């Protein structure tokens, strides 16, 4: 997926199966790999996968989570994740947040 923004209030996404609109929700599947390309927004809107809005970073299976240099996040969803409800969130703007459900 590739990110876009709606000011400092929302992320938008393009890519296979991406829902239009602000801060869309995602369903990610166990064992699948997802790449989020946030290179065009990394300076102003760094994206991080978290356990909850404002919570700690979710690190299991995630490489380059909140990479302030490349803006790329790769998430290999574990077969037995410790959490099945996660969020993606801008580390600078709390309103830029959406849900990730793991099935």
Where are these regions (language model features)?
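Extracellular/periplasmic metallocenter environments
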Residues: 1-8, 15-19, 41-44, 64-103
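Aromatic/hydrophobic beta-strand junction motif of beta-rich domains
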Residues: 13, 36-38
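Short edge-strand/loop segments of extracellular domains
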Residues: 50-56
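Surface-exposed ligand/attachment interfaces on beta-rich extracellular proteins
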Residues: 18-21, 25-27
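Structural beta-strand segments of beta-rich domains
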Residues: 24, 32-34
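Beta-strand signatures of extracellular beta-sandwich domains
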Residues: 35, 46-50
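Solvent-exposed, conformationally flexible loop/turn segments
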Residues: 29-31, 70
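Short solvent-exposed strand-capping/beta-turn motif centered on an Asx-Ser/Thr pair
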Residues: 31, 39-41
